[in-house]
Amino acid sequence: MERSLRKKRIGRVVSDKMEKTIVVAVETKVRHPLYGKTVNRTTKFKVHDENNEAKINDRVSIMETRPLSKDKRWRLVEIVEKAK
């Protein structure tokens, strides 16, 4: 039950240069409070990748987890789409 309360996101891998860690950029659409235009916001997350299986430009699903280091609070769930 508790696992379903964790946040899930889908994003693209922008860096895989670290050992067991990838950087995932997640895009969200937000309406501008004054002008009403839809703006794309990008947030980068450091994600734990135990087997180093995700590569750059892969589309991945990530899930919130306990703090694993100073910046890492997400873990890789699955690779949705491999890079071409």
UniProtKB/Swiss-Prot annotation:
Pfam families: Ribosomal_S17 (PF00366)
GO molecular function: rRNA binding; structural constituent of ribosome
Keywords: Ribonucleoprotein, Ribosomal protein, RNA-binding, rRNA-binding
Single GO biological process annotation from the record: translation
Ribonucleoprotein keyword on record: yes
S-S pairs: none
Residue intervals passing through the bilayer: none
PANTHER family: 40S RIBOSOMAL PROTEIN S11 FAMILY MEMBER, SMALL RIBOSOMAL SUBUNIT PROTEIN US17M
The protein's role, per its UniProt record: One of the primary rRNA binding proteins, it binds specifically to the 5'-end of 16S ribosomal RNA.
Protein's UniProt name: Small ribosomal subunit protein uS17
Annotated organism of origin: Clostridium beijerinckii (strain ATCC 51743 / NCIMB 8052) (Clostridium acetobutylicum)
Protein's gene: rpsQ
